Amino acid sequence: MNTSPGTVGSDPVILATAGYDHTVRFWQAHSGICTRTVQHQDSQVNALEITPDRTMIAAAGYQHIRMYDLNSNNPNPIISYDGVNKNVASVGFHEDGRWMYTGGEDCTARIWDLRSRNLQCQRIFQVNAPINCVCLHPNQAELIVGDQSGAIHIWDLKTDHNEQLIPEPEVSITSAHIDPDASYMAAVNSTGNCYVWNLTGGIGDEVTQLIPKTKIPAHTRYALQCRFSPDSTLLATCSADQTCKIWRTSNFSLMTELSIKSSNPGESSRGWMWGCAFSGDSQYIVTASSDNLARLWCVETGEIKREYGGHQKAVVCLAFNDSVLG
């Protein structure tokens, strides 16, 4: 892997944030210093993801996907794709970086071949409602797709077969995630509920089976994201209620509430907690919120360790990678 000294890709910790001010910002996680700003002219950024080899970052926006180089300070995207209708809401990668997946308001999830320099859409999965989220099963063979009609689709990439489940009809699924051990799947929705399933199967030719585990009334307002920790012991949920809540997966009890609510009764809402990402050791979490800040928190104590200030508008997505490649 060729990384130039002084580039984002040369840092063992990559933290990037983006949102409504049409910039992607890169931060030195421990100091809070912004080390690079990329102008993302065409629209807001809805989702960010770092490639598994840490060479590029994908930014999903309105009717496009842009990929920026992490190993140079090139301000321009090195790969662009503009052939998608409406907002691209979700983006991620196969673990070997062979393909990328996206989902969006055009009611499609797509798989893109990354082996050629021009993005080729290889496969399309069509649903009947705008897609809010797509996540990849750790087996790399099934995509979980959540849509605004309340449906969760499990798309088996090997057979092209799909199953669907609807936890609450007509209540939009905003985020879904499977823990690294493939023991649980969680999904949150626009009423603030979080559903958790036990997973079985999903090995070899077996299709993943979902067994309902629990329903958590996690938030009283819109929930925006759910993420399991790398060690599978924690689940984080983010919401429009200005909190990110950390739940223990041993019994799905609340461990910590991270809040950006003001202690000053006269101050209005600081806005939504849009997204989060755990550190590799599961001890810390970074959040993105619409008060223009990202924050680094200690998971156990709920203490804010660092604030990342510089965005001029809401921060709605982030990407965090502190795993050092061997």
Swiss-Prot record:
SUPFAM superfamilies: Quinoprotein alcohol dehydrogenase-like. SMART domains: WD40 (SM00320). There is a cross-link at residue 313 (Glycyl lysine isopeptide (Lys-Gly) (interchain with G-Cter in SUMO1)). The modification N-acetylmethionine is found at residue 1. Keywords: Acetylation, Cytoplasm, Isopeptide bond, Lysosome, Membrane, Phosphoprotein, Repeat, Ubl conjugation, WD repeat. Phosphorylation at Thr-51 by CDK1 promotes ubiquitination by the SCF(FBXW7) complex, followed by degradation. There is a cross-link at residues 305, 313 (Glycyl lysine isopeptide (Lys-Gly) (interchain with G-Cter in ubiquitin)). Pfam families: WD40. The keyword Flavoprotein does not apply. WD repeats lie at residues 1-37, 40-80, 83-122, 126-165, 168-207, 218-257, 268-309. GO terms for cellular component: cytoplasm; lysosomal membrane; TORC1 complex; TORC2 complex. The modification Phosphothreonine is found at residue 51. The keyword Transmembrane helix does not apply. There is a cross-link at residues 86, 215, 245, 261, 305 (Glycyl lysine isopeptide (Lys-Gly) (interchain with G-Cter in SUMO3)). Coiled coil: none annotated. CDD domains: WD40. Its main location: membrane. Belongs to the WD repeat LST8 family. Part of the mechanistic target of rapamycin complex 1 (mTORC1) which contains MTOR, MLST8 and RPTOR. mTORC1 associates with AKT1S1/PRAS40, which inhibits its activity. mTORC1 binds to and is inhibited by FKBP12-rapamycin. Within mTORC1, interacts directly with MTOR and RPTOR. Component of the mechanistic target of rapamycin complex 2 (mTORC2), consisting in two heterotretramers composed of MTOR, MLST8, RICTOR and MAPKAP1/SIN1. Contrary to mTORC1, mTORC2 does not bind to and is not sensitive to FKBP12-rapamycin. mTORC1 and mTORC2 associate with DEPTOR, which regulates their activity. This is Target of rapamycin complex subunit LST8. It comes from Bos taurus (Bovine).
